[in-house]
Amino acid sequence: AMFMFYEIALIPMYLLIGVWGSGRKEYAAMKLTLMLMGGSAFLMCGIFGIFYGAGGNTMNIIDIANHTGGAHAIAHNWQLLWFPMTFVGFGVLGALFPFHTWSPDGHASAPTAVSMLHAGVLMKLGGYGCFRIAMYLLPEAANELSWIFLVLTGISVVYGAFSACVQTDLKYINAYSSV
């Protein structure tokens, strides 16, 4: 359900930026939509991999975790394949470096209220999804690949902070401080 509603949320985001935005609004709306849909393709592959790796009976996260005995029944090699896919999918949504390039254009072209929704809700869904799905259902791969998390989040923090410091437009400051 989370994936489905995340995809449905792209439609109003595209319209809010593309119709009521300013500046290069069509470019920003299309870039946001295409990048988030590209991330969704990776995420969908990861979700289907988790579904089939867990027995293919349900898409409910709690039922999968209970059915697989705390998610350790998914083979380690499969976890190493599905975890990066879910991580990239949620990383694009959360605007994690290097998947953040949609964020500055989307924030700058969006109406102010939509820009705040991006920073306050949409981008946080990426981090929530990564913790709730990827790390909860694929714990062995998350533990083994945690160094990648640390490197990318460290780069995101430093890059976002320095990029926000040199901006003069308030929407770009908001965009880079959200990376």
Positions of predicted regions on the chain:
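Short phosphate-coordinating micro-motif centered on Lys-Gly-acidic
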Residues: 7
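Hydrophobic transmembrane alpha-helices and their helix-loop junctions in integral membrane proteins
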Residues: 1-2, 11-178
